[in-house]
From Swiss-Prot:
Homodimer. It is an enzyme of class 6 (ligase). GO terms for biological process: 'de novo' AMP biosynthetic process; IMP metabolic process. This is Adenylosuccinate synthetase.
Length: 448
């Protein structure tokens, strides 16, 4: 069935979330679904998440701006749950506009969005350097410290830029606090008040036309019959509450975060699409039960894992870091399905498995001699998980570009069918290549 033949109901909302440790291919799927939406919303995270789009063979990486910006006429929203670096935002806008993309007339930023300031970046990088071998693996872009300030109620918001005297007063108070940490604890240079003030206020006039009451706009858009697509960043297993803590990001990456992070009611979320790769990857530190390959760990150097990393081009789109690779972990996937209330799955990068003699699927674990069928909550327990695998015959035929389920190799269909069975939820979409058209549609998220 072609996407163009689908009759889409108006005024529906779909949330796209990653079900693994991020890098599941959400950007491509959001781009595909945007053909059926009038607005795309970012509701958490910052410019630590890169969404890679391949459109007509051209690669675009978006870090802050919703993927819908590549579709003329689609409104794009940055919700209050995001932490915003104006410097990163305008760099991204400049790159897009240089490529002929209209951004500023279609981008709307919540007035309540928390700002990332230079001292957040300095603290983030200083902490990671101090941790040494025990580092968490942050991107060093100030995301975590910005969220800390938000929760501590000392964060500066976008709307504060439009009241310069108040902004300056609060900035000075914040710098008194953070510079003490920087100089006395982390042993790095202080951040200059005047330079920071001048830089941040210089963004105010450029930001102002885009700043608005996003929650109200989303409500009005739905009321007028517009479909909205909520674009999650990172993945469920990196969620600050539900991930492999403390090896997590600083925000809630689950579907429920769309309500608080964009200002919409829970009943407005009609369908939750969980994105999962046909195998698993992870960047940075933290437990990974089905791991096969880690460039930094001599004990994890299996050839098949390196092949997955090489064929799958598994390098971070923002950091450039090599990703750790492993077999698909359905026990972890089930945890994500439960937390998010996933309606259906989209399996990405199936083509990376082409040509393998056999494919394995982690269906549970042995932990301290006991069988476990769901990813544990604590990192120490996850680190003790020994994977229990089911093994499937591989397929030699190429799946690249296939657009119909029945045209997939029989062994690929058997693998996907078993994933559905063990996960307990249908696979509604399958991605068979990086281009938006290389997609199999089984159920349409905006139609279900």
């Amino acid at each position: 069935m072609s996407a163009s033949a689908v009759n889409v109901n108006p005024g529906r909302n779909v949330v796209v979330v990653g079900t693994q440790w991020g890098d599941e291919g959400k950007g491509k799927i959001v781009d595909w679904l945007t053909d059926h939406a009038q607005g795309v919303v970012r509701f958490q995270g910052g410019h630590n998440a890169g969404h890679t789009l391949i459109i007509g063979g051209k690669k675009t990486i978006l870090r802050l701006i919703p993927s819908g910006i590549m579709h003329p006429g689609v409104a794009c929203y940055i919700g209050n749950g995001v932490v915003l670096s104006p410097e990163a935002l305008f760099k991204e806008i400049g790159e897009l506009e240089a490529a002929g993309v209209d951004v500023q007339n279609r981008l709307f930023i919540s007035e309540a969005t928390t700002l990332i300031l230079p001292y957040h970046i300095a603290i983030d990088q200083g902490r990671e350097a101090r941790r040494g071998a025990g580092k968490i693996g942050t991107t060093g872009r100030g995301i975590g410290p910005a969220y800390e300030d938000k929760v501590a109620r000392r964060g500066l918001r976008v709307q504060d830029l439009f009241e310069p005297e108040t902004f300056a007063e609060r900035l000075r108070e914040n710098l008194d606090y953070h510079n003490f940490v920087l100089t006395q604890y982390l042993g790095v240079a202080a951040v200059d008040f005047q330079q920071t003030l001048d830089t941040m206020l210089s963004y105010a006039d450029r930001l102002k036309p885009m700043v608005t009451d996003v929650s109200r706009r989303l409500y009005d858009a739905n009321a007028a019959g517009s479909n909205l697509l909520f674009e999650g960043a990172q993945g469920t297993l990196l969620d600050i509450d539900h991930g492999t803590y403390p090896y997590v990001t600083s925000s809630n990456c689950v579907a429920g975060a769309a309500t608080a992070g964009a200002g919409v009611g829970p009943q407005k979320l009609n369908y939750i699409l969980g994105i999962t790769k046909a195998y698993c990857t992870r960047v940075g530190s933290g437990p990974f039960p089905s791991e096969l390959y880690d460039a930094d760990n001599a004990a994890r150097q299996e050839a098949i894992g390196l092949e997955l990393a090489t064929v799958g081009k598994e390098f971070g789109s923002v950091t450039g870091r090599p990703r750790r690779t492993g077999w698909l972990d359905v026990a972890a996937l089930r945890r994500s399905i439960q937390i998010n209330g996933v309606s259906g799955l989209c399996m990405t990068k199936l083509d990376v498995l082409d040509g393998l003699d056999e494919v394995k699927l982690c269906v549970g674990y042995t932990v301290d001699g006991n069988h476990v069928d769901l990813l544990p909550r604590g990192s120490s327990e996850v680190a003790r998980c020994e994977p229990v695998y089911e093994t499937f015959a591989g397929w030699k035929e190429s799946t690249v570009g296939i657009k119909e389920w029945d045209k997939l190799p029989a062994n690929a269909r058997a693998y996907l069918s078993r994933v559905q069975e063990v996960a307990g939820i249908p696979i509604d979409m399958v991605s068979t290549g990086p281009d938006r058209d290389e997609t199999i549609l089984l159920r349409h998220p905006f139609k279900v």
